[in-house]
Amino acid sequence: MTQATTRSFAAYQLLLESSTTTGTFVAPCGLTERSVQFTKDLSDTNVPDCDNEDAASWTQRDVVSKSVRISGQGVMALESEPRWRAAYESDQPVNVRINKTGNKAAGGGYWLGQFHLSSFEDGATKGNKVTKTIEMQSTGPVVWTDAAA
């Protein structure tokens, strides 16, 4: 039996552009879960059969828009708190890079786009560490770049 080749948690990174150094991306510490959801909004059109108008029509779908949503949760390092707060307080989007480590043959590369921090939540339970939950929504294109061969 051949096992599937997989990626570790650390090999799937969420990086925010530094607020002080343009073009430098930094992974905020503390997220123990993260996910990226790619969606398309579709428009449905029922297209009839011209030879048999009584037959059920088939639905055809056209892409109207695309969007990417990032979510994450975990404990938040105090060192990461100022960057998240700055991203929320700003009315401008943040440049975000989503890294998948590995070479091109292994599916490595990254997505790059601008995102608004749309949700920023702290939580606390007695006896546990303070938690952080975030959600980011893309604005404009999110472009994939293959890793080097």
What are these regions (language model features)?
Residues 1-6, 141-149:
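Viral virion structural and adsorption modules
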Residues 75-118:
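Short, acidic/charged, Gly/Pro-enriched secondary-structure junctions
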Residues 2-73, 114-133:
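Solvent-exposed edge beta-strands and adjacent loop segments
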Residues 130-144:
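Short solvent-exposed strand/turn elements
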Residues 19, 41-45, 75-81, 101-104, ...:
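Generic structural motif
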